[in-house]
C-alpha cells in the first residue's frame, strides 16, 4: 500500500509491476525512512500467499524456505539504518520447521500456505487512518494465547480491563503525553493502551524475557508506531536499567509479583540513586517495592504512575514498611490505593491492588482508598473474575466506577474513603484496605 502510494505520480497502480532498478532503489530509500524496512515486489505478502496456493501441476507451491529468507531479509534491510535495533533478530523465535506445524515439510508448507491464503483475503483497512485492524488482531491473538498459557501468561500480558484503568488514571487531565514508560513491558499492550486514551509522542519499555521482548517490538510495529517513536530494551530493569537518563510523564507497569532480585546481595544497590534514600532495600525475595522505587525515580515532576502489585505491599512490615513510610511521610507521593478483585489475572488468583503515585500531588493531605474487590464490583466469567465494561452506558461499569471515584475524591459507603495522612500515621503506615474502607 505504501509503495503504491509512492507510485501514483508515476502512473503505476501496483508495486508488484515494478522491475526498474532505479524505481526500486527510490522506493527502498523512502521505505526505510517511513517504515524502517524494505521488501521487494516478489517478497510481498500477497505474492507469497498466491505462490503457496498455486496449482502444483504447473508450478511449485513450496514457500517455507522462501518465507524464512524473506523474514531474514527484513532484518538485513535495516542493517546500518536508524531502525536496526528495532528489527534486529525480531523473528528469532519463529521455527517454521517445528513439528507442531506438521510432521513433514509438505504438511508444514500446506498449513502455512492456507494461513497466508486466508489472511490475504482479509481487508485490514490499511488505508483507513482511524482503523487498526491489524494491530487489534495481533492484540487479540496475544490475549487468546495468554488465556491458555497458565502461570506464564502473567509474564507478558495484562488483562485489558486492568490496562484500561491504569491508562485512564495516568492520562487524567491530559490531552497529550510527551512519553510513556513501562519497566516490565511484556508484550507492550499496556503501553499501547495508554495511547488509546491520549496521543503519545514516545514509547519506552524494558523487558527481561527475550521472546516477550520480541512480542513487544512486533506489537509496536503492527500498531503502526514509527520506529523512531518507540524504544524497547531487553535487559533486567532492576539490575541494568536502560533509560535512567529519561523522565516520563506517565509510568505504568504490571511487574512480576513478588519476584526475586539481587537486593542486598549486590553491594551496588545500597548506593544506587533509585534506592539509597529509603534507607532499606526491598527484600531479596520480594522485588515489588524495588520496582516502585525504580518507577518513582523515572517519573517526571508533572507525571503520574500507576502500578499493579500484590496486596502484600500494603501491609508487609520490616524493610517494606520503611519504604512505604518514606513514600507517604517524606515524599507524600501515594495518591491512591485501589483494591482489585482476586482472580482477574492470568496465571494467579491472588488479590491485587493498584498504587497511584505522583511527585507533585494536588490533594497533599489525604490518600484515596477504593475497594473494588467485593462481589458487587465484578462478574464471574468461567474460572476468572472480570470487571464489567459494557458499551451500554446504562449498565454497570466497574472500570468507570473506579476511575470516577479516583477523580472525584468523594467518600462512597463501603467503596471509597478519603483517608487523611494523620490516620495513616496512626496505623503505622499500614495501608491494608479493611482498616479504611468499611
Where do the model's predicted regions map?
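Membrane-interface junctions
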Residues: 140, 169-176, 298-301
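A conserved structural/catalytic subdomain of Rossmann-like adenosyl-cofactor enzymes
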Residues: 241, 245-438
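Non-catalytic, mostly N-terminal accessory regions of nucleic-acid modification and defense proteins
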Residues: 1-170, 228-237, 339-343, 365-373, ...
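Alpha-helix initiation/capping motif
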Residues: 105-108, 126-130, 155, 205, ...
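Conserved S-adenosyl-L-methionine
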Residues: 152-253, 258-269, 274-277, 289-290, ...
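A generic secondary-structure signal for well-formed alpha-helical elements
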Residues: 3-10, 145, 198, 224, ...
Amino acid at each position: 500500500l505504501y509503495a503504491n502510494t509512492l507510485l501514483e505520480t508515476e502512473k503505476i497502480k501496483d508495486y508488484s509491476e515494478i522491475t526498474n532498478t532505479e524505481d526500486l532503489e527510490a522506493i527502498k530509500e523512502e521505505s526505510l525512512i517511513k517504515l524502517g524496512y524494505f521488501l521487494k515486489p516478489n517478497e510481498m505478502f500477497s505474492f507469497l500467499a498466491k505462490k503457496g496456493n498455486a496449482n502444483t501441476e504447473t508450478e511449485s507451491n513450496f514457500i517455507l524456505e522462501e518465507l524464512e529468507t524473506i523474514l531474514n531479509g527484513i532484518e538485513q534491510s535495516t542493517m546500518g539504518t536508524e531502525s536496526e535495533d528495532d528489527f534486529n533478530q525480531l523473528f528469532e523465535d519463529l521455527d517454521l520447521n517445528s513439528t507442531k506445524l506438521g510432521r513433514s515439510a509438505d504438511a508444514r508448507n500446506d498449513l502455512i500456505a492456507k494461513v497466508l491464503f486466508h489472511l490475504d483475503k482479509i481487508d485490514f483497512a490499511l488505508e483507513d487512518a482511524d482503523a487498526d485492524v491489524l494491530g487489534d488482531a495481533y492484540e487479540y491473538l496475544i490475549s487468546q494465547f495468554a488465556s491458555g498459557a497458565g502461570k506464564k501468561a502473567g509474564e507478558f500480558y495484562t488483562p485489558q480491563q486492568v490496562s484500561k484503568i491504569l491508562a485512564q488514571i495516568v492520562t487524567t487531565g491530559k490531552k497529550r503525553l510527551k512519553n510513556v514508560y513501562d519497566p516490565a513491558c511484556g508484550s507492550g499492550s499496556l503501553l499501547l493502551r495508554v495511547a488509546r486514551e491520549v496521543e503519545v509522542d514516545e514509547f519506552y519499555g524494558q523487558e527481561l524475557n527475550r521472546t516477550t521482548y520480541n512480542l513487544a517490538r512486533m506489537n509496536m510495529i503492527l500498531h503502526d508506531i514509527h520506529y523512531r517513536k518507540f524504544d524497547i530494551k531487553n535487559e533486567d530493569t532492576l539490575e541494568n536499567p536502560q533509560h535512567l537518563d529519561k523522565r516520563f510523564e506517565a509510568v505504568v507497569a504490571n511487574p512480576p509479583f513478588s519476584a526475586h532480585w539481587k537486593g542486598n546481595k549486590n553491594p551496588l544497590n545500597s548506593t544506587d540513586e533509585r534506592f539509597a534514600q529509603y534507607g532499606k532495600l526491598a527484600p531479596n525475595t520480594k522485588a515489588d517495592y524495588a520496582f516502585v522505587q525504580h518507577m518513582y525515580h523515572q517519573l517526571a515532576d508533572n507525571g503520574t504512575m500507576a502500578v499493579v502489585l500484590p496486596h502484600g505491599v500494603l501491609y508487609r512490615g520490616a524493610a517494606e514498611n520503611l519504604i512505604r513510610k518514606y513514600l507517604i511521610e517524606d515524599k507524600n507521593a501515594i495518591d491512591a490505593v485501589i483494591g482489585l478483585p482476586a482472580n482477574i489475572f492470568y496465571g494467579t488468583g491472588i488479590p491485587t491492588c493498584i498504587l497511584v503515585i505522583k511527585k507533585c500531588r494536588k490533594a497533599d493531605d489525604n490518600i484515596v482508598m477504593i475497594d473494588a474487590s467485593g462481589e458487587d464490583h465484578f462478574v464471574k466469567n468461567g474460572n476468572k473474575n472480570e470487571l464489567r465494561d459494557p458499551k451500554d452506558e446504562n449498565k454497570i461499569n466497574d472500570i468507570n466506577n473506579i476511575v470516577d471515584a479516583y477523580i472525584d475524591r468523594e467518600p462512597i459507603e463501603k467503596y471509597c474513603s478519603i483517608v487523611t495522612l494523620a490516620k495513616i500515621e496512626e496505623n503505622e503506615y499500614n495501608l491494608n484496605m479493611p482498616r479504611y474502607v468499611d
